[in-house]
Amino acid sequence: MKMHSVSSLSRRGTRFLLGLLGTFLLGATLVHAEPYLVVSGDLRGEIKPCGCAEESDMGGLQRRGTVLSNWRSEHSDLLYLDLGNNFPEPSAQGKLKLDLIQQALKLLKPAAILPGPHEWNYGQATWDTSLPYLLSNAIDLPWPQVISQNVSGERWEIWGYVTPNLLYQNENDLPNVLPVSNALIQQWQSQSQPGSKRMLLFRGTSVEADRFLQSGWFDRILVGSSNDDELNQVTTFATATQPLQMIPTKGQGLYHGFSSSDQLDVRWLRLDTADWEPLTPLFTNYDQEVKQLFLSGLKRMQQLQQETRFVGAAACTTCHTQAHQSWESSRHSHALATLTRVGKDFDPECLQCHVVGFQKKGFLSNQLTPQLANVQCENCHGSAQEHLKNPLNHPPLDARQACVNCHVGSHSPSFDFSTYWPKIQHK
């Protein structure tokens, strides 16, 4: 008979016990497996934090990608949904952002996207047909009314509702986006598969939300943000029936948690969240396209330069020596350098608050109009042209209003006129 050492028997016993424990844990995991929900949305073109202030440096698609990737590695049954309203305000640069956002969403892979008013403003022709846009209260539109997902052995139906009040529809045509009604809910119920769990992506009024709540038909209702102030985030949507969870505005946070949870948790996308590497090429390409957009407008703007009303701070020095010295020692006199350091000295959305008269026949580029670089006298006092012709003609001054043109929202969350004004006060 072959003899085994005590240590050998001990090792076998340990492996046996570990095997039993692993089987038990695996069984427990299978029994308790359930969908892990992640919800985003309401980006409104804020593809990346501007970086103007550390305390408001939140959000961005690259940080979202990192967090989502980490959760996917931890939860095999992850269900990712997006509440839409992601596109920026219409503009030439906005179109570049739109393209980046949709390319990023392809990599982030949401199961469903609810198109919001911002998407509607650009027109359906701009919506990428390879993305899972969803609008359940639409008729005769090329988008599904319901998206089904099998997760953790459960069938989940994702429905989407956007109130017609937020969408432009030609008054001479029959409406193709319908308001909530008993007939609409009954139509949805007739399309539903028995035994399914149902989730509603919603953007509308509290009265409309109550209609859906009172139907008792949905397991969860998730609300797109109606809040415009990112410095005062509101994550609760009040209704007469019960409060609902509302996504943070401007993409600054995500909702996440198991589907059985009464309340999902908020994960804020703060400065300590790294950028997701797979999105880096998209942002590099976007920066190059924005630069080309900027350069393409220079020739046209140069032709208008002879009509400029701005003269630059150097023209003020002779008569306003002390004021000029005060300006030179302030951060305003180096405003453009803060953009140059991060490669944003060609980005129109940034330049408007870092130079004089951008897109107003003023600053063109640091090479063509260096005299109008940085925040100068004319940013606050207005054009000095008439004052130079007649020194007794003083430009109007509303210091507070001049400040809040740029020191606003997440760009300057700590702004307080009473503490900021003394830093640049001059006579």
Which residue ranges define each predicted feature?
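N-terminal secretory signal peptides that target proteins for export/translocation
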Residues: 1-12
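N-terminal cationic amphipathic segment used for targeting or macromolecule association
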Residues: 26-31, 158, 369
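Generic alpha-helical structural signal
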Residues: 8, 25-27, 35
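Acidic, metal/ion-coordinating pockets
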Residues: 32-282
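Bacterial N-terminal signal peptides
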Residues: 18-28
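Short sequence/structural segments immediately N-terminal
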Residues: 34, 43-49, 168-170, 263-427
